[in-house]
């Protein structure tokens, strides 16, 4: 059976991921007029730029949907966001500033929960607004078929008839007006924005040019901290984790993880924390550029990693970072629920996150400028007396112990010296004139 439909399946139930914007509104009305039985599904992802979610299903029914459903995805989204923090599932960074994979996390939740809701209504054909050049078309494809193996995909933006009739936003606006809906296009921005409770993505249009920077972006989750007229005061923040779960901010305990994340967003957003400018490789290996916001993710990530480094040993931290980068890439590719991702994620949650209990006190300033003021945990393995430069009683080790430890290093030093001589004899290394320092053959100079 063909999975991807190239033309509208007339007379059949077709579910559309409906945002209420011009694109999906025009698509829904067009599909209805062409003979499809339209069902609209809207994900409440806690988008910071969405004023009234309850209005969206009503609009869908006005445009011809037989049924319009609002699916509350916020709790699941926060659950996945915390799992990503616990497992360090972030592979894109520039100069130590991280992209927190907030859009891939949103797609994992949307793609599974909306298709599950459609399946309950007997809807086995799904359409959404993703284009053929982006990542989302593959992410939604994977998550949709994982959730419903009988699913078929119909995307208006892959249907040549739809493109010919309503190929651009101007045509869509004119179409809606002609049908009596007087749908006006929103003011055209210099970039496009996609957001959820975890973060916001700004990309495309002017941001495709690398000489257009972060300063053209109007943040929706924080403040434009780069502007001189933006007043940002330093703020002390205390973040508490219990067995890997964030539980309290500034002494206030949260039983609702969504409420905690909203507060973390508010705190981090006051400073512009978590904004980054990244060049990344899309799934199809072409590079794209985005400006990202994730104030709450950044705040929790900083505190979590501080506790990780104070609690776990070096080899555990190394595996956490290596596995986290691999897991981040799988998440980005739409494989968050694949077995290889679940294996990496569960390992980190069990053996790394479970030990992370404690409080971290930070001072937030402008943007990603912060200081860590204090770290407390009953599980800390940081013991300053072990390495104190002062004289201490019951020292962990003595000078004689260190002499013995260094003497044992003679074994591998001798082996290394032998290997360096071998490499020199074979021409891989050379010694510079008048020096015993080895150089790689192609480093001569």
From Swiss-Prot:
Protein residues bound to L-citrulline: 99, 135, 139, 192, 201, 203, 280
Ligand binding (ATP) = 17-25, 43, 129, 131, 136, 194
Which coarse location class applies to the principal site listed for this UniProt protein? cytoplasm
Gene3D superfamilies given in the database record: 1.10.287.400, Argininosuccinate synthetase, chain A, domain 2, HUPs
Q: What is its EC number?
A: 6.3.4.5
Provide the Gene Ontology terms for cellular component: cytoplasm
Reaction catalysis annotation? L-citrulline + L-aspartate + ATP = 2-(N(omega)-L-arginino)succinate + AMP + diphosphate + H(+)
Q: Which Pfam families match?
A: Arginosuc_syn_C, Arginosuc_synth
**Which biological pathway?**
Amino-acid biosynthesis; L-arginine biosynthesis; L-arginine from L-ornithine and carbamoyl phosphate: step 2/3
Spell out the InterPro entries in the cross-references. Arg_succ_synth_type2_subfam (IPR023437), Arginosuc_syn_C (IPR048268), Arginosuc_syn_N (IPR048267), Arginosuc_synth (IPR001518), Arginosuc_synth_CS (IPR018223), Arginosuc_synth_type_1_subfam (IPR023434), AS_cat/multimer_dom_body (IPR024074), AS_multimer_C_tail (IPR024073)
In Gene Ontology terms, what is a biological process of this protein? urea cycle
The cellular location(s) given in this protein's UniProt record come to: Cytoplasm
Q: Residue span of the signal peptide, if any?
A: none
Q: Where does L-aspartate bind?
A: 131, 135-136
Record's keyword terms, sorted: Amino-acid biosynthesis, Arginine biosynthesis, ATP-binding, Cytoplasm, Ligase, Nucleotide-binding
GO-annotated molecular function: argininosuccinate synthase activity; ATP binding; protein homodimerization activity
- Give the record's family classification: Belongs to the argininosuccinate synthase family. Type 2 subfamily.
Complex and partners: Homotetramer.
- Name of this protein: Argininosuccinate synthase
């Amino acid at each position: 059976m063909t999975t991807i439909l190239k033309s509208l399946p007339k007379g059949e139930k077709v579910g559309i991921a409906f945002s209420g914007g011009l694109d999906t509104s025009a698509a829904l009305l067009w599909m209805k007029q062409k003979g499809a039985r339209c069902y609209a599904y809207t994900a409440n992802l806690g988008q910071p730029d969405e004023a009234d979610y309850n209005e969206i299903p009503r609009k869908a029914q006005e445009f011809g949907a037989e049924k319009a459903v609002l699916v509350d995805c916020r709790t699941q989204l926060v659950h996945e966001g915390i799992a990503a923090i616990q497992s360090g599932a972030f592979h894109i960074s520039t100069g130590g500033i991280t992209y927190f994979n907030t859009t891939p996390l949103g797609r994992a939740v949307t793609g599974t929960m909306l298709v599950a809701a459609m399946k309950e209504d007997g809807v086995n054909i799904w359409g959404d607004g993703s284009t053929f050049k982006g990542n989302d078309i593959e992410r939604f494809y994977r998550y949709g078929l994982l959730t419903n193996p009988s699913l078929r995909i119909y995307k208006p933006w892959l249907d040549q008839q739809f493109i010919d009739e309503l190929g651009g936003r101007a045509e869509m606006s004119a179409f809606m007006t002609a049908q009596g809906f007087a749908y006006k296009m929103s003011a055209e921005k210099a970039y496009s924005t996609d957001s959820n409770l975890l973060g916001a993505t700004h990309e495309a249009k002017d941001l495709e040019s690398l000489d257009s920077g972060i300063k053209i972006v109007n943040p929706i989750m924080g403040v434009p901290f780069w502007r001189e007229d933006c007043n940002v005061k330093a703020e002390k923040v205390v973040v508490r984790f219990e067995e890997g779960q964030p539980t309290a901010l500034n002494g206030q305990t949260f039983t609702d993880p969504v409420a905690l994340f909203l507060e973390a967003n508010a705190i981090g957003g006051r400073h512009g924390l978590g904004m980054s400018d990244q060049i990344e490789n899309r799934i199809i290996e072409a590079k794209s550029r985005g400006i990202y916001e994730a104030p709450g993710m950044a705040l929790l990530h900083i505190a979590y990693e501080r506790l990780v480094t104070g609690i776990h040993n070096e080899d555990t931290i190394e595996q956490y970072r290596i596995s986290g980068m691999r897991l981040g890439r799988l998440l980005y590719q739409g494989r968050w629920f694949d077995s290889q991702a679940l294996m990496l994620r569960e390992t980190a949650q069990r053996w790394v996150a479970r030990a992370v209990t404690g409080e971290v006190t930070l001072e937030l300033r402008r943007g990603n400028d912060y200081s860590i003021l204090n770290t407390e945990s009953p599980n800390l393995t940081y013991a300053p007396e072990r390495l104190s430069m002062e004289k201490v009683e019951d020292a962990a080790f003595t000078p004689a112990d260190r002499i013995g430890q260094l003497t044992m290093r003679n074994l591998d030093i001798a082996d290394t010296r032998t290997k360096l001589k071998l490499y020199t004899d074979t021409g891989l290394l050379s010694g510079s004139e008048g020096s015993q320092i080895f150089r790689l053959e192609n480093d001569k100079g």
